[in-house]
Amino acid sequence: MDFSKLPKILDEDKESTFGYVHGVSGPVVTACDMAGAAMYELVRVGHSELVGEIIRLEGDMATIQVYEETSGVSVGDPVLRTGKPLSVELGPGIMGAIFDGIQRPLSDISSQTQSIYIPRGVNVSALSRDIKWDFTPCKNLRVGSHITGGDIYGIVSENSLIKHKIMLPPRNRGTVTYIAPPGNYDTSDVVLELEFEGVKEKFTMVQVWPVRQVRPVTEKLPANHPLLTGQRVLDALFPCVQGGTTAIPGAFGCGKTVISQSLSKYSNSDVIIYVGCGERGNEMSEVLRDFPELTMEVDGKVESIMKRTALVANTSNMPVAAREASIYTGITLSEYFRDMGYHVSMMADSTSRWAEALREISGRLAEMPADSGYPAYLGARLASFYERAGRVKCLGNPEREGSVSIVGAVSPPGGDFSDPVTSATLGIVQVFWGLDKKLAQRKHFPSVNWLISYSKYMRALDEYYDKHFTEFVPLRTKAKEILQEEEDLAEIVQLVGKASLAETDKITLEVAKLIKDDFLQQNGYTPYDKFCPFYKTVGMLSNMIAFYDMARRAVETTAQSDNKITWSIIREHMGDILYKLSSMKFKDPLKDGEAKIKSDYAQLLEDMQNAFRSLED
C-alpha cells in the first residue's frame, strides 16, 4: 500500500486522537487510550512512525504487532491510528518487482536511501507513480454504459508476456460518465469516472485491497487441468492440478527450494508469485540472480521468466511479524491476477517459518500453547490460507476463468513428518510430495519418496489424460506396482541374495532400477533434463513398461520348454537395448523437437520387439 499517504504524527493537530505506548516486548507493543480502534487496523508507533497492526483489543488497551524493528520505542510515545486495514496496491508494475512482507518495493527503497538495509519508518508507495503505462480502453465501453464490480474496462501491456487487465474494484458499480482515451497515463491519473445514485466516483489504474480478505468470485469450479512441472516423478506419479494445493515437506538439504524454483521456472502457469518467507537471504538473492537470465519461448520469441514473476522477499533476518503478513500479501497478489483470467502459481517457501512467527507472537501475547508450543489456531490459519486456492469463474464481464495453485514448502525440524505444522498441512492439502533425506544423501534428485507421496487429483485428471494421452493411466498404475513390488522384494534380497529369486522377480528388480535411475531421477542443472515435457515423460515410461511386459512374457512362455529364456540371457543379448532405454533422457526437447523424440522412441520400441522375436526363435 502507499505508506506515504498514511497520516503522520506531526501533521495531527489534536493530541486527543493519539494513543500512547504502555509496554514493549520485542515486536509486540501495548498501547493505551486506543478506544475506538478496530481489529487489524494499521497504526504508526512512536516518533519514527513504525508500521504496526492491531491484533488484540481489551478495554482501551490495544496490542499491536509492529512490522519493523522496535528498538528505541519508549513508554509514552504516541501511537497514531490510520483507520485502514493492512492492504496491498494492485495495478500495473507488480510483475518483475520485488517487495518485502508488507509490499514495500525493495529496489525503490534501495535507490532512494542508498542503504543496504530498510530504514525504519520509510514511506514509499508500493507501485511507482512515475512510470507511464499505455492504457487502451475496452472497445464496447462508452459514456452511458453500465458497469459492475470485476468488469474489465481497459488493458495495459505491462510487458510482452502479461497483458494487465484493468478491472473495476469488486464493490463498485455505476454508469460511466468519463473513460480516458487511449494514451500514456501513470497510476495516479484518473482513467474512469462512474456515477451511482447521484454520487460520482473517480478511478485510477490502481485498486487497494485488504490482505486478510478473500477477493470475491462468481463460483468455484472443479479443477481438471494438470499443473505440469517438468519434473518426471511429479508429472507422472503425483500430478497436481491448476487450482490445487500441494505441500513439499522435507528436511534440510533435500531440495525443496530447487523444486519450488523449477516450478516457477518451467510450470505451465501464466503468472508466478514467489514468497520467500523466513528462509535464507541467499536463496532469494539466487532467485534474483537466476530468474532474469532464464528464458522461455512464447510464440517463437524468447522472453525472460522474470516478466511473469513477482517476488515477495521476507528473509529470516527481517522482522518476525512481517513474515505472517508476507503470506497474505502473496496470496492477495495471486488472487488479483486470477481475477484477470490467468492461471497463477504461488510458491510459499517455507510455511514452517510462518508458523514459527505465529508461535513467537502468540508466546509474547501469553496465549495458551498447544502442540510443540504452536498456538491452538495454527490449523485454522493454515486452512484459511490454503483454501484461497482453486479454479474459479471470475467476477464481472467478459466471462473468464482463472486459478490459483499453492505450493507450500514445509521444513519440519529433523525431517520429522509428525511435526504439528506438517500434520496440520497434510490434513488440508490434496497433494503431498514427501522428500526423503536418504534419497538426497544418495544424490537421487528430485528426492521425492514414491512410496509415501500421494495425489488426490488422480481421478480428476483421468478425463484429461484419456483425451490427450490415452495410454498413460495404465502405464502409471503399472509403474507404481513395479516400484511397490521392488520394495517388497528388497527385504528378501537382503536375506537370501538375488540369485535365489524367481526369474520374473529378477526382471521386476532390474526394471524398477531402470525406472528409478533413469526415469525418476532428473538432473535439474543440464540443458536436456532440467525440464521434461509431458510427451517425453509418457514416451520414456511407455518404452520401459513395454520392455518389462515383453521380458516377462518371454520368460513365462519358455519356462516349461528346453531352451528357456532367463534374465541373464536377456541381459546378454540386449545390452544395446538396455543402454538405449537408460539414455532416453538425453534427448533434448529444445534441440531435437517433439517429432524427432517421438519417432526415436517409436523406433526403440520396434527394435525391442524385433530383439525379443529373434530371442524367442
Curated annotation (Swiss-Prot):
Post-translational events: Phosphorylation at Ser-384 by AMPK down-regulates its enzyme activity.
Enzyme class: translocase
Subcellular location per the Swiss-Prot or TrEMBL entry: Cytoplasm; Cytoplasm, Cytosol; Cytoplasmic vesicle, Secretory vesicle; Cytoplasmic vesicle, Clathrin-coated vesicle membrane
Source taxon at top rank: Eukaryota
Gene3D superfamilies, per the entry: 2.40.30.20, 2.40.50.100, Bovine Mitochondrial F1-atpase, Atp Synthase Beta Chain, Chain D, domain 3, P-loop containing nucleotide triphosphate hydrolases
Listed GO biological process terms: ATP metabolic process; cellular response to increased oxygen levels; intracellular iron ion homeostasis; synaptic vesicle lumen acidification
Membrane-topology descriptor: Peripheral membrane protein
InterPro entries: ATP-synt_VA_C, ATP-synth_a_Xtn, ATP_synth_asu-like_sf, ATPase_a/bsu_AS, ATPase_F1/V1/A1_a/bsu_N, ATPase_F1/V1/A1_a/bsu_N_sf, ATPase_F1/V1/A1_a/bsu_nucl-bd, ATPase_F1/V1_b/a_C
Positions carrying Phosphoserine: S384
Task performed by this protein: Catalytic subunit of the V1 complex of vacuolar(H+)-ATPase (V-ATPase), a multisubunit enzyme composed of a peripheral complex (V1) that hydrolyzes ATP and a membrane integral complex (V0) that translocates protons. V-ATPase is responsible for acidifying and maintaining the pH of intracellular compartments and in some cell types, is targeted to the plasma membrane, where it is responsible for acidifying the extracellular environment.
Family in the record: Belongs to the ATPase alpha/beta chains family.
Matches recorded under PANTHER family: V-TYPE PROTON ATPASE CATALYTIC SUBUNIT A
Subunit text: V-ATPase is a heteromultimeric enzyme made up of two complexes: the ATP-hydrolytic V1 complex and the proton translocation V0 complex. The V1 complex consists of three catalytic AB heterodimers that form a heterohexamer, three peripheral stalks each consisting of EG heterodimers, one central rotor including subunits D and F, and the regulatory subunits C and H. The proton translocation complex V0 consists of the proton transport subunit a, a ring of proteolipid subunits c9c'', rotary subunit d, subunits e and f, and the accessory subunits ATP6AP1/Ac45 and ATP6AP2/PRR.
Name this protein carries in UniProt: V-type proton ATPase catalytic subunit A
Lineage start: Eukaryota, Metazoa, Chordata, Craniata, Vertebrata
